[in-house]
Every structure is written in C-alpha cells, then in structure tokens.
Amino acid sequence: DNSYKVSGGLHGVGVSVVNALSSKLELTIHRAGHIHQQEYKHGDPVYPLKIVGDVETTGTIVRFWPSTETFSQTIFNVDILARRLRELSFLNAGVRIVLRDERVALEHVFDYEGGLSEFVKYINQGKTHLNEIFHFTTQAENGIGVEVALQWNDTYQENVRCFTNNIPQKDGGTHLAGFRAALTRGLNSYMENENLLKKEKVAVTGDDAREGLTAIVSVKVPDPKFSSQTKEKLVSSEVKPAVEQAMNKAFSEYLLENPQAAKSIAGKIIDAARARDAARKAREMTRRKSALDIAGLPGKLADCQEKDPALSELYLVEGDSAGGSAKQGRNRKMQAILPLKGKILNVERARFDKMISSQEVGTLITALGCGIGREEYNPDKLRYHKIII
C-alpha cells in the first residue's frame, strides 16, 4: 500500500494515453504467482485480462506500437530516452535501468549506487571543483522526504535542478525556495562568524552564493500540488519549510566539519560579490551621460567626424602633450585622439574591481563603446575598427 505514496500523479493515466495513441499495446503483469496478459488495438481491448502462466517474480511489461495514423513520424530518439532514464537512475540510487537500441545493437546500462552524489559528479565532469560533494537524505515528520547533493566549481553559472517524486520542475517551486533560503542563510552565518564580510568589506547576495553551484534537490511528497498539468513548478506550501529545515541543519554541520571546503566556497562567493559590484559600476559608467557632452564620451577624447566605425581610427597617445601634437597633425574626418597617462594598470593581472576603478581604463572602455562584463560586453558596438597605440 505504501508503494504509491509518492507517485507522480494519477496512476494509469500515462499508459491510458499511450494506449490511445498506439495501433497495438501488450500488457504482461507478473503478480501473485501468475502471468497475466492483455492486448489492445487502437485503445480497445482485444480480449479480457487472462492468466497465461505461473511465475515467482513481480513486475509489469508494457509493449506498444505508436499509431502511424496519429503520428507522421514514429522514430524514437535514443538520446532523449537515455537522458531521462539516466536521470531516473540517479534519482533512485541502486535501481538498475537497461536501455537497448536493437536498431543498432546498442545497450546503455544505468546503475548509480551513489544516487544524487553521482548526478552532481556527472554534471561537473571536466570542471574544477572547490569542495567534495555535500549529500544528505532525510525524512521530515510530515512524511516529506528531502535529498540534496551539491558542489561548487570554478565556472560562473548556477545549475540547480529540482525534482518532485522523480518529476523534473524546470521552473522550480517551493522546494527550490526552501533550498535557496537555507543555503544563503547558512553561508551568511558562516561568513559572519568568521568575520569575513567585515574584513573583505563586501555585501553578499544569494546570487553570489550560487555562482558556480551545481545542486540537485529531490523531494518525495505524498500529495504534491503543481502549478499546471505539465508539473513544471511545485506549489505545495508544506515543502518549503521541510526542505529549509533539513538543509539548514545538514549544511551548517557540513561547513563546520569541513573548514577547508567552507573557506574555498566563501572565497568564491566574495569574489562573485566583488565582480558583481564592479560590473554594476561598469554599467553605470558606460551608461552615464556627460552633462556637457550629449554623447557621453570622455572629455579628453578628440573624436573624428566619421560615424562609420569601419572608416574610423582611434589613436591612443601618451599624455596630454603628445595628445596636443597628435590633434594638430590628425585628419579630423577619420582620426580620433585619446590621450592616456603614461603607465596605466596592467589589467591582465589586476582583479576586475580594481581594473574598473582605474580612471584611465574607464576612459578607454567608454571611448571604445563596447561595454564590459559578461552581460554588457558587445563587440558589435565598437566605435573604431582601427586602434593605433
């Protein structure tokens, strides 16, 4: 009776739909020591359920032939099937799933004893990780099962995947909200206790904490509620506190018991906060318009008359005196002059926030017009196609 407590939905709806869209469907059920069988054609039973033999095992075999009257194409994409079956094997540690493609004599076997830990490891392969995988499983008092695995890597993207009763929610929901709240609280608490925020003079957000994070959040809920039939967002209100409490306890303990990992994670988060602040300053700088110059270009820039970047040249010269000489000798139509101080910052070795705070670098960014940072940079906006130093 407990087998279906955490199912994905109404039992039988899936097979009923497949049956309706198939020219033929065969059911073979091993149960109570017998083999039961029934066949359908275009959704209608050919004969009633009958016993055709004896067996000691239990299980169900479903075979179906997609209807060519309904579908113009009935070719199965093995990659899509493999992706979903691999996912199911990760979500159910120890369950062995075999996918055979008899068209090309290919067999995939999915069997992951490590469950979600192996899921995170699979996603993070080829990336440099900052900590060993954190993984816990717990059962809340209200019958909700919570399982989380996570690891930070050296990339800048957040990759958090959420599942309810093995069904993916691409739009997240209450389990994601609970996870994020606990993660941010746990990390902030650790950094405050270690006095890192005051020492580094940064304000950290949830987005900073999740930069480079790979996580799987899987919940088992007795009666889940979703925002739509496609189950893309979980809306069960009781799930958020269950996930938040479980994550709070387990993650706080992890940070205390793994000081080296906690230090590496905190360092990445502080870097992310600095980069975010630097990017904000960069955006403000590139968008800021000069009160005296409508184009918002640097005051020292002697721009050219030509508006076509392909025909325009920018000369970067050292100091105001050289700038004066260059301005006198230039072709105003196509040559722009930008005087810079002799020795500006070595941006290859400088941190992003230090680079942005340099007035000379800022002037250069504004003059070139491309913007800066992952979200703002656009080389198509370059104002000069020839740059002469």
Curated annotation (Swiss-Prot):
Its main location: cytoplasm. SUPFAM superfamilies: ATPase domain of HSP90 chaperone/DNA topoisomerase II/histidine kinase (SSF55874), Ribosomal protein S5 domain 2-like (SSF54211), Type II DNA topoisomerase (SSF56719). Residues 312-389 form the Toprim domain. Gene3D superfamilies: 3.30.230.10, 3.40.50.670, Histidine kinase-like ATPase, C-terminal domain. One of its GO terms (molecular function) is DNA binding. It is found in: Cytoplasm. It catalyses: ATP-dependent breakage, passage and rejoining of double-stranded DNA. Its EC number is 5.6.2.2. Keywords: ATP-binding, Cytoplasm, DNA-binding, Isomerase, Nucleotide-binding, Topoisomerase. It is an enzyme of class 5 (isomerase). GO terms for biological process: DNA topological change. Disulfide bonds: none annotated. Pfam families: DNA_gyraseB, Toprim. PROSITE patterns: TOPOISOMERASE_II, TOPRIM. The record marks 343, 346 as: Interaction with DNA. GO terms for cellular component: cytoplasm. It comes from the Bacteria. Few gyrases are as efficient as E.coli at forming negative supercoils. Not all organisms have 2 type II topoisomerases; in organisms with a single type II topoisomerase this enzyme also has to decatenate newly replicated chromosomes. A type II topoisomerase that negatively supercoils closed circular double-stranded (ds) DNA in an ATP-dependent manner to modulate DNA topology and maintain chromosomes in an underwound state. Negative supercoiling favors strand separation, and DNA replication, transcription, recombination and repair, all of which involve strand separation. Also able to catalyze the interconversion of other topological isomers of dsDNA rings, including catenanes and knotted rings. Type II topoisomerases break and join 2 DNA strands simultaneously in an ATP-dependent manner. Heterotetramer, composed of two GyrA and two GyrB chains. In the heterotetramer, GyrA contains the active site tyrosine that forms a transient covalent intermediate with DNA, while GyrB binds cofactors and catalyzes ATP hydrolysis. Belongs to the type II topoisomerase GyrB family. This is DNA gyrase subunit B. It comes from Acinetobacter guillouiae (Acinetobacter genomosp. 11).
